[in-house]
Amino acid sequence: MNESLDFSPYLERWALQPDGEPFATHSSRLLPVRHRGAAAMLKISSAEEERFGHVLLNWWDGQGAARVLAYDHQALLMERATGGRSLLEMVRRGDDDEATRILCQAIERIHAPRPGPLPELTPLERWFDSLYAAERRYGGLYVDCANAARYLLETAREQRPLHGDIHHGNVLDFG
């Protein structure tokens, strides 16, 4: 096992008990745990952008997203979704309207104005670096897209962090 993705230090530091089998995504390893008797999820990230996500998830403070119980640069301890509803399953059963309504409610909650300063995140301009490189290298449609991105960035009136990975499989049921 990659030592940087070992759960042991966090199990000890945050007094966690494993409560299921570990699993992995393209950017993280996750372990269902118990924290002070409650269901929680320990997530250890291997991708830098995921680590910025820890800060953002903490800033959202459980409003439309999982509540963060503890975090550091590499690991995140968050409440675990234990409800039985799956938006993907709802869509498969033909209830896309209801699934989309729930998805939109989650988006509305996480993008609502918050008191206090924004967390320090990757500037949106940096996310467009690859678009600007493609503009220089390939021209064509990339020029139009890069110009549209510049216009939107220059004329933005409010700054709010965007989720960046919200979809039917990533909105969970917290009961």
Regions found by a protein language model. Name each.
Residues A38-L77, A81, R85-I110:
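A conserved alpha-helical element in kinase catalytic cores
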Residues L11-W14, I107, H111:
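Hydrophobic, Leu/Ile/Phe/Ala-enriched alpha-helical segments that form helix-helix packing faces
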Residues G37-L42, R51, V55-W59, H111, ...:
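Extended interaction regions within the primary functional domain
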